[in-house]
Swiss-Prot record:
Subcellular location field: Cytoplasm
EC id: 2.3.1.-
Keyword tags: Acyltransferase, Cytoplasm, Nodulation, Transferase
Principal location listed in the UniProt entry: cytoplasm
Role: N-acyltransferase required for nodulation. Acts in the production of a small, heat-stable compound (Nod) that stimulates mitosis in various plant protoplasts.
Name assigned to this protein: Nodulation protein A
Pfam families associated with the record: NodA
């Protein structure tokens, strides 16, 4: 199904309650097929799962929200080095538009990374998405790193779970203000907060 989409950039404080309700519904429908647990954070009007983004790239078409990518500037610890990054995450595309692709949202978001003058864009994805993320390089400078464990805090403190989790994921780095050679060599990254 081909759909004409219109991308908008929205700062978090610009979103109204109706926007959050529409985005929450979008995420439930997008993440629900991957498991009910994945859709659970988006109950009601909550349009974020872990850390709340500060900026969102949202694609709309005649059926509403078509795709989404969030951005949050934060300091992460790469090995022993504190590093400012713009974390990209909370990505979704409506199931009927799977061909829209994450690369479209990256083409919208990369100029924003340049305007924000962050050293790097940063993201983490499951190993199952390796071939998918390796295609990023066609449109934006992206480096996919493996063999790195990432620690995140849980979004909520719970009595039945430890406060942090460590995942073996693929780390995606987008050089912006610095070269990739400036990215610290390490096998462990600490988000010092929940994932986006």
């Amino acid at each position: 199904m081909c759909s004409r989409v219109r991308w908008t950039l929205r700062w978090e404080s610009e979103l109204q309650l109706d926007d959050h309700v529409e985005l929450a519904s979008f995420f439930r429908k997008t993440y629900g097929p991957t498991g009910a647990f994945n859709a659970k954070p988006f109950e009601g009007s909550r349009s974020w799962a872990g850390a709340r983004p500060e900026l969102r790239a949202i694609a709309y078409d005649s059926n509403g929200v078509a795709a989404h990518m969030g951005l949050l500037r934060r300091f992460i610890k790469v090995g022993e080095v504190d590093l400012l990054v713009a974390e990209l995450g909370l990505y979704g595309v409506r199931p009927d538009l799977e061909g829209l692709g994450i690369s479209h949202s990256l083409r919208v978001m990369y100029p924003v990374l340049q305007q924000l003058r962050v050293p790097f864009g940063f993201g983490a994805v499951r190993h199952a998405l390796q071939k998918h993320v390796e295609r990023f390089g066609r449109h934006v400078p992206a480096n996919v790193l493996s063999g790195i464990r990432v620690r995140s805090t849980l979004p909520d403190a719970r009595l039945d779970l430890p406060p942090t989790r460590i995942e073996d994921v693929l780390v995606v780095v987008f050089p912006v203000e610095l070269a990739m050679s400036d990215w610290p060599t390490a096998t462990f990254i600490d988000r010092n907060g929940p994932e986006l």
